């Protein structure tokens, strides 16, 4: 079974997380998300993550680490989440989407796609947010 691989960056700065308003698609209408996108053919995850975040939020990633992978059999997708803690450049929405820096505890006030609920729960357990 062939999967579509998607890389997602969780950008962390001083106990806040960067979120963007999801694109207007039928399955993500009025939702928030972490920036990222599809892995292109012949790209590895690291290259895709750096490319996607440069394209979407204008940053050059300097420090990151793998966080979680979630596989969705029914949609045939794999979501690869990375924690980004250091970068170069000023973060903004290059694609014109609404964005916010929010505290981890405030994530509960925003609607996210269902796969993110596991990620948000795991983030809340992490020491560097305490």
Swiss-Prot record:
Q: Which reaction does it catalyse?
A: 8-oxo-dGTP + H2O = 8-oxo-dGMP + diphosphate + H(+); 8-oxo-GTP + H2O = 8-oxo-GMP + diphosphate + H(+)
| Segment forming the signal sequence | none
Q: Which residues bind Mg(2+)?
A: 36, 56
Query: Which cofactors must be present for this protein to function?
Result: Mg(2+)
InterPro entries linked: MutT-like, Nudix_hydrolase, NUDIX_hydrolase-like_dom_sf, NUDIX_hydrolase_dom
Keyword DNA repair on entry: yes
Motif Nudix box covers 37-58
Its biological function?
Specifically hydrolyzes both 8-oxo-deoxyguanosine triphosphate (8-oxo-dGTP) and 8-oxo-guanosine triphosphate (8-oxo-GTP) to the related monophosphates, thereby cleaning up the nucleotide pools and preventing misincorporation of 8-oxoGua into DNA and RNA. It prevents replicational errors by removing an oxidatively damaged form of guanine (8-oxo-dGTP) from DNA and the nucleotide pool. 8-oxo-dGTP can be inserted opposite dA and dC residues of template DNA with almost equal efficiency thus leading to A.T to G.C transversions.
**Protein's name in the database:** 8-oxo-dGTP diphosphatase
């Amino acid at each position: 079974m062939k999967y579509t691989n998607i890389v997602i960056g969780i950008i962390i700065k001083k106990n806040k997380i960067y979120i963007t308003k999801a694109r207007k698609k039928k399955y993500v209408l009025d939702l928030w998300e972490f920036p990222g996108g599809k892995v292109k053919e012949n790209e590895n995850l690291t290259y895709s993550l750096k490319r996607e975040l440069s394209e979407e939020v204008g940053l050059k990633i300097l420090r990151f680490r793998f966080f979680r992978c979630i596989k969705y059999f029914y949609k045939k997708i794999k979501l690869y989440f990375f924690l980004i803690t250091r970068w170069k450049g000023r973060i903004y929405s290059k694609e014109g989407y609404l964005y916010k820096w929010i505290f981890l505890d405030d994530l509960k006030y925003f609607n996210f796609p269902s796969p993110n609920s596991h990620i948000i729960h795991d983030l809340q357990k992490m020491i560097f947010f305490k």
